[in-house]
Amino acid sequence: MSQSGFAQFGRAYIDRLEVAARQIPLAPVEQLAEALLGCWRERRQFFIFGNGGSAGNAIHLANDYLYGISRVTGHALRVHALPANSAVLTCLANDEGYEHIFAHQLAVLAQPGDVALAFSGSGNSPNVLRALECCKTRGVRSFAVLGYSGGKAKALADVPIHVAIDDMQISEDLQLVIGHMLMQWLYEHRDQAR
């Protein structure tokens, strides 16, 4: 037996993750699934964004939705991970302010009927809030996967997907769980996207 006690710690983390995953509200996730299927079918755009680990998750999932699905189906969602382009991010942060790095991209790219998904542990990041506000003015349907109390984003998103967990890493894990769940569901329903 190791003196570090890692196995016990690891098991406790997995247990906390399992409890949190069972708290995912499936009704709003289903709304997102249906919105993404419609987005795919109608060739509209899908925007994903977040900060830090949430930004990494947005980029990861954009790859899954773009390549992971199209590799097998021959077509995929028109997905944009807004944190992915460091030149655009640093330009906007420098010239417009960090709180506008996502909203400005949406103002330029988004069209009515597009779909946006915010990832935020706290739900209070100013750049996420400005982006959700921009979605309202652009006619973009917004969803937000949120942890902790849900923050201000819970009221700003058209459809919040909130799990009240006070652990940032588990909150970020749930973003990927939901994202991968959606990817597999979209793949299973690919015939409806033609």
Question: In which residue ranges do the predicted regions lie?
Answer:
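A charged, well-structured terminal subsegment
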Residues: 108, 170-194
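Short glycine/serine/threonine-rich phosphate/pyrophosphate-binding segments
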Residues: 54-59, 124-131, 153
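Generic N-terminal amphipathic, Lys/Arg-enriched alpha-helix
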Residues: 1-24
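A short, well-structured juxtamembrane/interface segment
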Residues: 22-42
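Short, glycine/polar-rich helix-capping loops at beta-to-alpha or helix-loop-helix junctions
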Residues: 145-157
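Glycine-rich, small/polar surface segments that engage phosphate groups of diverse ligands
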Residues: 38-110
